[in-house]
From Swiss-Prot:
Its main location: cytoplasm. PANTHER family: ADENYLOSUCCINATE SYNTHETASE. Binds 1 Mg(2+) ion per subunit. It comes from Phocaeicola vulgatus (strain ATCC 8482 / DSM 1447 / JCM 5826 / CCUG 4940 / NBRC 14291 / NCTC 11154). This is Adenylosuccinate synthetase. Homodimer. GTP binds at residues 12-18, 40-42, 302, 328-330, 408-410. Coiled coil: none annotated. Keywords: Cytoplasm, GTP-binding, Ligase, Magnesium, Metal-binding, Nucleotide-binding, Purine biosynthesis. Its cofactor is Mg(2+). Pathway: Purine metabolism; AMP biosynthesis via de novo pathway; AMP from IMP: step 1/2. It is found in: Cytoplasm.
Amino acid sequence: MKVDVLLGLQWGDEGKGKVVDVLTPRYDVVARFQGGPNAGHTLEFEGQKYVLRSIPSGIFQGNKVNIIGNGVVLDPALFKAEAEALEASGHPLKERLHISKKAHLILPTHRILDAAYEAAKGDAKVGTTGKGIGPTYTDKVSRNGVRVGDILHNFEEVYGKAKARHEQILKSLNYEYDITELEKQWLEGIEYLKQFHLVDSEHEINNLLKSGKSVLCEGAQGTMLDVDFGSYPFVTSSNTICAGACTGLGIGPNKIGNVYGIMKAYCTRVGAGPFPTELFDETGKKIRDLGHEYGAVTGRERRCGWIDLVALKYSIMVNGVTQLIMMKSDVLDDFETIKACVAYKVNGEEIDYFPYDISEGLEPVYAELPGWKTDMTKMTSEDEFPEEFNAYVTFLEEQLETPIKIVSVGPDRGQTIERYTEE
């Protein structure tokens, strides 16, 4: 068996949580391979809205194994709150959620360091979520991290050394803080974590594949936030692309099957950083309001703009995407004209590729298509799609040279329409 990978192609918030929940009935296992509680997946299930930060979205399917891989960074306090809320709403976890012992822990001092570093940057700040993600990955790469497996052996010693090291850094930054309540909740989270299956997930997932089980790998955030291929330095601290599934779960590249790339019918971004198609007018505000574009974790307003096909082509290339999934098509139901960026203009020269630096002097070149002016939220089949919407989809497929297999026309899992485009 091979694993299929589901990931975002833009700046995150593409709707991965809903899609993975729609796809999970086809798989035996759902595995999260990177990121931390900075990324929130919003799902609607049986009339209730859930935001998952660390737990894989397959948790709503009662018979699935869910794995948090080694590439994930885990905050025990936030994990405990998330897990307890799910269990209270009738979704038991302890037998179905397996956590890699090699996953790194976000410490209370990582969160303090995150705030201190951002404060020190002033106007040059990246706009982090303040969840300690960057400092945790920094410790991981510098071989100073604390891993989930450490809570089983010599934990107080390992944690004490890491905490002391962080306190020295904070002292040098002259940053005032009070860790008391954060640490109390965190230590309670550590005890809670011990109740779960802590596993060598690389062995588990490969053994599951050998036994014929089907696996869906779930990414967080989006390709344009990848630490290597995103709009650096305004990126996250992990590899969000398909290759991250290999390093974040311990599977070989030859085990990758389908790569599902998720995109919105338009584009959004949270926080600082370049965004070529960003709209600062009433159109951008209209997209934000109709799409309810506010961060699932932070509540921050998302910046909104037209779809960027130059960036999407780049994302499809670096991920090896085999099928596209387009989310929030219904948000554009009320527009007379839809725009799509097909090139960039830099210093008067038109380019159709994603450049090294997109931060300054870049102007989007748009193609315009007629809007469909139809309520798509009640549609259940592609046969009901208006002619103008079909034309928009066909245009995107031709530009991106990749089939759009699934179209979402609303937030509920039932508002998901599969297409049968010939490959």
